Amino acid sequence: MLLATTVLLLAITSAQTAADPKSDVYAGPIAKALEKAGPNRAEIESFLARADGTGDAQKRDAARWLVANMDGHGFAVIELTTTDGTRLEFDALNYKSLTEAKAAFDAIEAKNPGCDFRKIRFDSDLEHASADFLFAHLDEAFGTWRTMPWAKPIRYEVFRDFILPYRGSNEPLGLWRTPARTRLAEICRENEGETDVRAFGEKVRANVHPWTGFTDLFYMHPTDQSYAEMCERKLGRCEDITNMISFGMRSVGAICASDYTPWWAASDNNHAWEVVLDANGQGHAGLAGRAAKVYRKTFAHQPDSLAAMKREEETVPKWLSSSHYVDVTAQYQTTSDPTITLARAPEGQRFAYIAVFNSGSWKPIDWANITQGQAKFHAIGRNICYLPMIHVGEADEPAGAPFVIDLDGIVHTLAAAAGTSDSTSLIASTTKPDITDPDTGALRARTIVKPDAAFELFLWKDGAWKSIGRIERGETAHAFESLPSDGLYWLVEDGSEKLERIFTIVAGKQVFW
């Protein structure tokens, strides 16, 4: 009789909590999640019921937290398509090297101008995750957290954010906790007396890192790999490696965050890396390049994100469209909070962006509200060149002159407005400086002006690159005169991939950004 009464009271309490949003912050998001689950709703409800049936208040809360924040998570299939979405036959893994894969890609692109890697399918977790899958992850995560000696100091909220999540990015779903923990059984036995979770985490990180090696071939395989796929292929890109390390660490109750910069500020591409955290969920790694912004992935929705702020009809740049990240730039470096006056702020435009120059174009990397024609950005990196932008439809458009924030936080506007009395000259010798590859640590030697190639010099003026001179094939004179001293320049080889770096001119010499 006592048992029956207890069960009834629990059921009534659960029902009252679910019915009263004031007593349960998850009630509203869970209701929306269940609607979006569609035919899979019964599986999500079954998962919640099983967690509730354990009688474990923390497991119940954790299950509700997962479902409340599940919207937006899923497996993304990204493939090469034409501009109208027609799939093109291309798999980088069919080639031995990035060079071979790029040659094949270039041949396809020649026949299909504008083709690119695009998301062709998204299997949302709400619509595809089973109750068995979710409960297995929940149960194993709690078992690890509650039994491993180094995990005892970890608060519940930190456990929930960094150990409980069952996925790393947009990879296929997988039950990776048991196999990863099995592979780490020896290091766990060797550290049974360890109580410092960060110290143990560093050991696990070092142990797991070799499980997946880096190869640039995966730059052209943008679909994230599952744990099983990485175990089979043993290769991936930085995102894959970070996910593998996070899987390994979570499986044994160590804490790992996944940080990333969407676009490097002084080189091409982007980067993701793992960060070993302490029991309070704090920590950061070193930077492998110049970063304007560093973000940390989260499973939870962030109410202050651009995705949460924008209206349904508003479009935003791709890399800022997620609500599952927080800004941790200030944990890595000294930052600035500049207020930028926009040269262009159309009526009704609520957000402005700043962009960095990467892979031949300006890439938005941060956002701010527009107030009376101005935008104040927060915690952006120094020693970097930026361009203010707005997003119109699906296009990113310039909204002001580029500017540099120097190491002291001083803003230098590059309006190319200096007159002849304040002009400068340039003897062009280099199109790209020495750059250390963030993924491999290898030094990429500078690219010089070659006598057997032709080059064009561009100046950023009035919102676009303007051609202001050329170096023809075989010319020995590489001098340009009467250039604006406050200009931003770009020297591009004819027929190149446009990977040359932008620069300013100081005392007649190129300063690259």
Over which residues does each language-model region extend?
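Short amphipathic beta-strand segments in non-cytosolic proteins
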Residues: 350-368, 454-468
